[in-house]
């Protein structure tokens, strides 16, 4: 039976981001109806970590909004990492905090963070069409810094931003050059507050994207993330094909600003596809 890894997300700093990423409701350039807060209370984060681990999550990603890591964010993420690791939950801790230099990433590594998530999002050529406040090259350099720091790299992208198939191939080729251990695959969902005007990908096109990702990243853990609930809706037959086509990890629970599937029901559905839940990241 195929083994599936479950990963979960905690949005520990939300909203008020000065970047203008056209796909993100956390940008202050868009008027997204989201919760905004500076730093989530440590006790709340610990409760989330315990609850999600009990449900079977092996990965736990601490996400902060904003362009990049700074001293305050570094100290906060380090504090959370130490507190979670003291619980001895056996969670693989991931930080996702934007652009970061080598010294910052080494600091997080030493504090107990195991991997760093920084998505390329799309191709180098298409990126300027969805963001003008930072460059694709900055993203790529941060990924390289994570690897140099001895952290695991989690890096992927978004499909359905009006990019071409050539852009998808270019992004996947760039990701392959980084050899990430995990690649999140997101499907863009249209939102009236965001400037990207496009129709949601069909389930068939989304499956083609997964097949393409598997071709370029045969050894990466391909993790289906945002958009799964909308693209596949109640189409169990096509959702099950995700795992036939290469997906072997799933985001369990909510995303940054949108609701995910109810964890227990999601796990029941995954089991009904003949999948088993991994009990170790290794």
Swiss-Prot record:
InterPro entries: Aldolase_TIM (IPR013785), BATS_dom (IPR010722), Biotin_synth/BioAB (IPR002684), Biotin_synthase (IPR024177), Elp3/MiaA/NifB-like_rSAM (IPR006638), rSAM (IPR007197). One of its GO terms (molecular function) is biotin synthase activity. SUPFAM superfamilies: Radical SAM enzymes (SSF102114). It comes from Helicobacter pylori (strain Shi470). Homodimer. This is Biotin synthase. Belongs to the radical SAM superfamily. Biotin synthase family. GO terms for biological process: biotin biosynthetic process.
